[in-house]
């Protein structure tokens, strides 16, 4: 049996047109062992749990091993940035695959694929670009996805770094 666990500890959604934070969540206000009422499970089973330091986080169940998702925050159609602190756990020869997305199910996603040592930008379930990336299973990861619209064109940028280290100035992956 393969067991893989994914946890989210912080979510932030920013509207780039006026730089206001329109959604923040650290899960501290939610009841333990329940799924938050203001979020929606697409697939998989999720619940609020606590880590060793007592901080609450959203945790995905180890099974079933499928592509799982949670939708949260207000609907956004314009330029925005999403930043999430996430941790995936490796078990034996199994690796997690995790990511974040903007603009709904068919929007762009920034996905970390440790089994292939890469980061991908995905649109409509298909990778549109990938770059090499070495995941650290011992650390929480920070993922930031930014979509900018200008003159009917979009620029998608993705950053990934270990929690506690300095965020990269330049994105690790871009697509236009």
Where are these regions (language model features)?
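Sec-dependent signal peptide recognition
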Residues: 2-9
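Hydrophobic core
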Residues: 9-16
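Boundary at the C-terminal end of the N-terminal hydrophobic targeting segment
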Residues: 17-21
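Short tryptophan-centered beta-strand motifs in secreted/extracellular beta-sheet-rich domains
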Residues: 27, 84, 138-150, 156-158
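Extracellular glycan-recognition surfaces and repeat-rich motifs
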Residues: 31-57, 66
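Secretory/extracellular carbohydrate-interaction modules
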Residues: 53-54, 60-121
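Short, aromatic/His-centered strand-loop micro-motif at the edge of beta-sheets
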Residues: 122-144
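Short, solvent-exposed beta-strand-to-loop segments that form ligand-recognition rims
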Residues: 159-176
């Amino acid at each position: 049996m393969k067991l893989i666990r994914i946890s989210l500890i912080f979510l932030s959604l920013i509207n780039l047109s006026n730089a206001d934070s329109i959604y923040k969540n650290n899960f501290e206000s939610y009841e333990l062992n329940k799924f938050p009422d203001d979020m929606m499970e697409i697939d998989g089973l999720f619940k609020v749990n606590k880590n060793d330091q007592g901080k609450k986080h959203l945790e995905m169940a180890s099974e079933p091993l499928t592509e799982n998702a949670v939708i949260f925050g207000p609907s956004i159609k314009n330029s925005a940035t999403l930043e999430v602190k996430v941790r995936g756990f490796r078990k034996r020869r199994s690796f997690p695959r995790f990511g974040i997305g903007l603009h709904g199910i068919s929007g762009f996603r920034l996905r970390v694929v440790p089994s292939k040592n890469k980061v991908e930008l995905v649109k409509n379930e298909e990778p549109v670009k990938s770059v090499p990336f070495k995941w650290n299973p011992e650390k929480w990861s920070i993922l930031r996805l930014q979509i900018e619209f200008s003159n009917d064109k979009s620029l998608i940028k993705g950053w990934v770094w270990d929690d506690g280290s300095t965020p990269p100035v330049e994105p690790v992956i871009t697509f236009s």
